[in-house]
């Protein structure tokens, strides 16, 4: 579906949030989102939650004056929820957000400025995950900005911190479980999107994820796989994902649904 471009004083942004049992974190995330200084269409996709978080979100957003759409995706897996949410987007830009992440009030405004300044050749504006504390915050910023400068054709952030020109995102196929049903889907998606243009990072474009993540070994790649990714030239990235990494993830059972198990969360 081709996006309906909305310019001027009207809404240019859609925010897609996949949700599965996020009662402990979603309220704070929504509070940060409705504090944005830029107008947006909020799309919340319930992926089979059983903890009441979506009903609570309806109550929390009842008096919010912006446009909010609640969708239901019964197929288990964040990738399906994201696919459903992206299909409902008809604005110029799309922000993918996580239900456990804080977004500063200027988040969408910063992304808008980056897209408008860079022009149509830039298809993604990526935030970095800022860590708490002055030293850790500066280190996380410098790390991501340097990596993005050295390897501009690769992904250097979380899917919770990615924003896109909707036309490029949808033309690339968006999140697609038939192409990539595994973890690390944000990297695979960026591989496809960046075939259509460039990405931009900036020191003032950031967000902060929750500290609930502890042992993430079952939902991420190994150090060796990460090194291979960074050392693989752009012309061979297709083979890296679909011939190398997919086979390894499949053998380890690292499909997208492992994110629902929450064995990696702090309890």
Predicted feature residues:
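Conserved donor NDP-sugar-binding/catalytic core segment of glycosyltransferases
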Residues: 106-136
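N-proximal low-complexity "stem/linker" segments adjacent to membrane-targeting elements
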Residues: 1-32
